[in-house]
Amino acid sequence: MRSAALMLTLLAVALSASAQDKPVSYSKDLQPIFKENCLSCHKPDKKKGKLDMSTYADFMKGGKQGSPVKAGDPAKSLIVEMISGKEPEMPEKGEPLKPEQVDLISRWIKEGAKQN
């Protein structure tokens, strides 16, 4: 019985570690977060702050405040500041992003903010 519990624990740790090792995908991981939390204000027909987040290319162009991402450096990326509760806090309307969503976006930026 103990060995079965140990095996399950080791399997859980291994699966958790492999999920962290997998690169963050813009289209699979981030696009759904942006769609749910950002696109009501940052889309082609309503670009608040002149920022369109509907596609990778438009998002990376940035808006009135410049590029939201400094690839490789989440701490210097405007989007991370805004979704981490700094002023102006984003999203303006609705609940703040969950910590795991902020972490995912930060990891993607640290990994180079690739279009994948």
What is each stretch, according to the model?
Residues M1-A5:
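Positively charged n-region of N-terminal signal peptides that target proteins for export
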Residues A17-N116:
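Aromatic- and Gly/Pro-enriched helix-to-coil junctions and flexible linker segments
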Residues L10-S18:
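Hydrophobic h-region of N-terminal signal peptides that target proteins for export
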